[in-house]
Amino acid sequence: MKRPDYRTLQALDAVIRERGFERAAQKLCITQSAVSQRIKQLENMFGQPLLVRTVPPRPTEQGQKLLALLRQVELLEDEWLGDEQTGSTPLLLSLAVNADSLATWLLPALAPVLADSPIRLNLQVEDETRTQERLRRGEVVGAVSIQHQALPSCLVDKLGALDYLFVGSKPFAERYFPNGVTRSALLKAPAVAFDHLDDMHQAFLQQNFDLPPGSVPCHIVNSSEAFVQLARQGTTCCMIPHLQIEKELESGELIDLTPGLFQRRMLYWHRFAPESRMMRNVTDALLEYGHKVLRQD
């Protein structure tokens, strides 16, 4: 059985994290040549490339598996050492999460664990359609995703759903939708997307108004909180989780522009198996809180 030296795995990890050999060498306090030698040693052991030497470098499929193994070992090792050593460094917990979960339910869900356990969070924000890929690549140890199928050697549980409403301010509705939300009116109404891969707004309009992708003008803003601000100030119409704007809807500051129409995103919690005790605590906290505030039907 091939058992890699974890120094060589750490070199591979550093090249990916630091996006190059030079910075990886600085991070590890060794020469760039030593980094290359360690990775070459690892590649010789497995008889195949572990890095695609692009700029920045990226792991091959086998490289991703080894990085995932490293994440699991580091988490279990750090937890064990934490039991044996007083005053040890808090555990680093890298999770891939979508921006809307981060803006609504995720931090309250993690609050009890953060209060009771020595954890350093590293939250990597990614669209919920792509968070699972970070887990696959070994960049994180857990991910909130819309994918229901677990990766090999991973566990998955349903968290619940976020319901997205198509909302805007009353002045915005009066300006752009004086005769209601129609296909022709939507072509002139400015909207917003999180990034160029965010297709929720376009999918909603295509499904309900038969508007093809790219037909509606969209701002690009990488912030869930900014979506709410843009809608409140009458700049755009937006797809926003109901959970995020309950107060604004109740006060009338925002209105549901298409009552009865919404987009539902079911969310799942993915993590490596077996779980460490700390990850079990995180899982329990996320599931307990998620089942309270997210839609379960």
UniProtKB/Swiss-Prot annotation:
InterPro entries: ArgP, ArgP_gammaproteobact, LTTR, LysR_subst-bd, Tscrpt_reg_HTH_LysR, WH-like_DNA-bd_sf, WH_DNA-bd_sf
Source domain of life: Bacteria
HTH lysR-type domain sequence ranges: 4-60
Keywords associated with the record: DNA-binding, Transcription, Transcription regulation
GO molecular function: DNA binding; DNA-binding transcription factor activity
Pfam short name (any one): HTH_1
Residue ranges flagged as DNA-binding region: 21-40
Role this protein plays: Controls the transcription of genes involved in arginine and lysine metabolism.
Family: Belongs to the LysR transcriptional regulatory family.
NCBIfam families according to UniProt: argP, PRK03635.1, PRK13348.1
Oligomeric form and interacting partners: Homodimer.
Protein name: HTH-type transcriptional regulator ArgP
Gene designation: argP
